[in-house]
């Protein structure tokens, strides 16, 4: 069963139907103000499709990691006029306001996701209801199938059709991702989910060649399965971020006081050997931007070669490495990027990460490169340097995209109907 063969929202009869859409409105908030509405804007096409077709929308999402209460505790709280599981920092109320402005129509906010039957029963075609944070109830992410089902049953009673547009949580077996479609006996992908599935199917299936994977971030241990799985599919592997120093130490270079996972040196050696056997070209940093402390300075030290001096830590890839990595991306027809090249949040160490984003944006724009950013920090960096709009696909799911690249299946995708 390939990734892309899932029923689409376009194949659903939506007229006069109450449509449950699991969206991902897990947006950053600062004192109740949304600082980046990208995830809300990404969900608009599916919502607008339902409204245009004469249906109404019941939207479900999580936000953050609230403590949550059990359904039994919620019932008790409700009887005394309380709001179950409520946490000010995790309420979706500001999202309802932002969504209303983006849609130019009222959005009704239901302050208790499991006590919204009354609100939902009064809906007419064209209406939009946003339920409060589904994680205010522990059953949403419970390890017990029965508990997840109990919550899903109530939510499923609010609608006729289930659409999943929350790729960011597709790796989670939860009441709203897998419970509802199982109870309703059907489920289809929204436009965002469809786009995610389609791009990952391409890169993991039969992508235009050569294919380069750019992998960064702090720990080798976080990327072991990804590196192992991708090695069977790629032509080039560019390694950056703190994980690169474990690979350099494994090859005998001095890394000063840079971060290193001693327990992963053997894995690094075996991966390099495997890559050689498979004729995958692994490229490691050939120079570094360093300092004696983990802090921003005006003139950090730039090394001459791979070796990092005693008492120094590398915090970004150097100019010669940037040039080499950019040239390699320029030779390729497909590129997938997961993890920053350095501590890009600090200006002196942001050049490497931003250069990768720019090389991918330019390659896509000028040479038709198929470029994919696997969510998380890399997506944030591309957004920060203004390149996100030029990339073929910036994933909205850090954890979900990582699991796909590791070769795992996603419960929130496999539960959806197969394409007829």
UniProtKB/Swiss-Prot annotation:
Q: What PROSITE patterns does the entry give?
A: PGLYCERATE_KINASE (PS00111)
GO terms assigned for molecular function: ADP binding; ATP binding; metal ion binding; phosphoglycerate kinase activity
Sequence positions that bind (2R)-3-phosphoglycerate? 23-26, 39, 61-62, 64-65, 135, 171-172, 219
Q: Which miscellaneous remark does the UniProt record hold? A: In T.brucei, three genes code for phosphoglycerate kinase isozymes, which are transported to different cell compartments.
Enzyme Commission number(s) = 2.7.2.3
Q: Does the keyword Cytoplasm apply?
A: yes
Task: Report the enzyme's class at the first EC level.
Answer: transferase
Q: What is this protein called?
A: Phosphoglycerate kinase, cytosolic
Q: What is the lineage of its organism?
A: Eukaryota, Discoba, Euglenozoa, Kinetoplastea, Metakinetoplastina
Q: Which organism is it from?
A: Trypanosoma brucei brucei
Write out the residues that bind ADP: 217-218, 223, 241, 314, 338, 344-345, 377-378
